[in-house]
Amino acid sequence: MMKRALPALATAGAVALLLAGCSGSSAPASDGPAEITFWHGYTEADGKVLDQIVADFNASQQKYKITTETKTWAVIDDTLLPALSSKEGPQIVAMPAERMPVYADRGAFADLSDFYASSDSNTADLVPQAVDMVKVGGTPYGVPTGFVPLAMFYNKSLFSAAGITEAPTTWDAWVADAKKLTVDENGDGTPEQYGVAIPDHATVANGLWPSLLLSGGGQIVDGDKAVIDSPENAKTIQYWTDAITKDKISPTGLDGIAADQLFSSGKAAMHVGGPWMASIAKDNNIDYGIAAIPAGPAEQAASAIGVAMGVTESADDAQRAGAEAFFSYFFQKDVATKWSLASGWPPLRTDIPLSDVSSNPVVAALSEIAPTGRALLPGVVNSTDVISDIDELTQKAVAGGNVDELLATAQTKIQQAIE
Amino acid sequence: MTTHAPSAPPRRRGAYRPPAPIGGRGPLRHSPRRRLTVVAFLTPAMVILTVFVAWPMISALRLSFTDASGFGREKFVGFENYVRVFTDEDILRAMGNTALYALLFTPIAIALALGFALLLNNPLLPLRGVFRTALFTPFIVSLAVAAFAWSYLLDPQIGLLNYWLRGLGIQLGNVLQDPTLAMPAVVLVAVWKSFGFYMVIFLAGLQDIPTSLYEAARVDGASAGQRFRSITFPMLGNTMGFVVIVALIAALQAFDQIYVMTGGGPYGSTQTIVMEIYQSGFRKLELGFASALSYVLLLITLVLSLTQFLFFSRREKDAA
Amino acid sequence: MTALAASPAVTASEAPSRRVSPQRRRRRLVSALLLVVVAASTLALMLPILIIVFTAFKPVAEVNAYPPTLVPGAWTLDNFTRIFTELPFARLIANSFVFAGGVTAFALVFDSLAAYALARLDFRGNKILLIAIIASLMIPFQATLIPIYQLVSDLGWVNSYAGLIAPRAADAFGIFFLRQFFLSLPRDLDNAARIDGAGELRIFGSIVLPNAVPALLTLGIFTFVNNWNDLLWPLVFTTDAEMGTVTSGLTLLTGPGGIIPQGVMMAGSLIALLPLAILFLMIQRRFVESVGTSGLK
């Protein structure tokens, strides 16, 4: 009988420990500033500036004290769920914007409608597309910390070697220039230098093809309907597939990271990338230029890379008030300007003039093209599946599949994903 | 329930049984001293396993009947998740892929391990210690790092393998983005990393086989192949059974290198069940569904392993 | 192919002096053939390891260069300095030792005790317990991660060594593995001891365990290596950067845009490999010795 008692004993012991653990959980300190933990993924020099902004906020008042923890974005994504599930999570967390809807939908983030409505929140002048990123079903669940459209980076030395003086501004010019910049000296069928690096899956911020589709006049999701199967999208995909496979202006099978590397190693003359390409290109001694993604037949649109932060459900009232106070502080004009210059991303307020950010040429250049920015899949909860459906579409198209069939399949799958 | 004790002393009919606590059948099995002993041996491990393995498994089972994300609201949904496991296209595809992966990985890894174990067991081979260490090294590399190294080797632009093979006139192309080559590639990485460990287990098993048996066979004129078939293979039955189950379980749970090298692509051709579990749980925050899928995987693995176990136990009994 | 141990004593004593030569010549030929085959295949299999070693010493430009090189053209220690400046790497290595070492120590003790009970002691539910233990191997860690984390957090052990080690202090694989091994050991010695009245713990400690050294060493290496290389658990469990392990620390190396600095990553991996390699080299000799003395039955 002892043996059967054993599991019971062990479980009883475990339960006892659990209860002991539970009762030991801390009641919030009744005096002293409310302690708030803030997770973010700014790991480079920009992270240090953000930490400084937080420190300044802490110094500016007595009621709240924020402590930051820096991890990579991927690690935050992997560790946030367990932390929240055991109430060990941060009260403020920043994450890539397309990850926000799924967390918001599951109740991880607090509804910030009242915050936005209040007059001293400093949110009235925020870039509207940036705010679009944090809304699910019309309700805002966070605030933007970064919003920048993908830009075209080009290698000035390779340009001048090919006799091209300006970055292209339309698709046709883009392809023409790329053809001139694709060089296969030894004629073995594999160019040593490509005109452009166009990934066909896992693109930079998953934004390259959405940019092209939008510029071609098509959309992916409209409200709660998948609308990817449209004549405009078919033309766009066919246009670019032909350019890649027939004119060979880019290798096939690239992903976003490989495309980054191709450009930074000087083997591709043009590349659609994020702001970090500036410092990477500089580290690799590439004389680079920044331009807007060339305009398509319908418009000049660039999918935006967005980062947002929100208040988690593990925050109590005091902590939530503190978080909102921090957000207001963060959006003050001077702080917003400082953050823009440090992060290398355009300012989040529309009323900050270009002259204020001219000290950082990358920021100035990106701010100029900021109007081309469009949020990626705003409000789509299951962005994971939609993005992989888009990837499958583009990858198979570039590999030679039938574009119309692929679009029909993608439409069905995306519709399923957003239901 | 009695357990078969292979070397229990034979029962003498009607004889007086001494009251010593011999490991074997009999009512004295349940003496308090005996039970205390059993408990004492089992307790430390059982406490850990009950608290940190059994209880979370029960938790996960409960979660599998809900739509929980791990935090916030959760709602009981009955068997909905399980139905979805068997009707969702992506999940069914993942099951097919996992089966393919297991079918490729298990025999190849075991054959390679056994082959090298036999070679390294041969006293005619010089520098055996060196080779044993070298062949074991892939095992001590973490799977993620191994995946990085292999991805780098297979990179279509700057990869060494592609470069060398191109020199020989073979165009490897973009292996990890090729729907037909991606799966063999991820299997290869796992085989490369794991065979060293299985090899060491086989070596231990081989060295347990008395050389006198081989001598007798030699004297009888048996060839190398015959010696392998009638001595080595049967005597390895216990070891083989263990390695097969362990390899199978590892194959059915394939995740790390796929996550690093292909992310489940291209077109989901390397998406395995555990990849789906991870993505459902951590990316789509569908912990309830992830738990249900885990339990289906557990059941499949259990059935397959029990079959293997029974198969090899019978062989072991025949061999002994 | 499987030319197994030929006993020199038998043939040498039987053979007349004329037949020794061809015999020895054939053995030398087989030796040479084996050497070539095994050496070639080993070298091929070592290629990825060589990649890790050499890439760690390559400057960034050469890592991405075309045509690719195996051996670095320019050797550099940059990657290594970066590893130690960008991460608290020394602390991470120490944490890895505590984690992997702690788990291995506890697991070897707890697992062998339980395995002994399963292999040698008859009790009701022995087979069922075994199946339950094996079954627990079949659920992937990703599924039980959240409940385990919640449990450990409720115990108040988040970010502590106790919490990191406890869930692994006994493991189903080890119990299964040792149970199989104990089963293969002959019972004569322990039965004799039992008849003499020795207690089970004594039998376990002085008879069974000494004969199980190769299995214990194998399991020890397996457990240590796997926990040293484990990523998901230390990553999720330690939110404090200083408490992480080497593997979880390396994930923090991802640069902006998801670009991984290959050279630095390889340097870190190489350093992470070294303790394991040294450990195996040390254990390996004992492994051979102990098998040599106890193996032939």
Residues covered by each model-derived region:
Chain B
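A structural signal for multi-pass alpha-helical bundles of membrane permease subunits
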Residues: 34-320
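Short, Lys/Arg-rich, polar N-terminal cytosolic tail immediately upstream
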Residues: 1-32
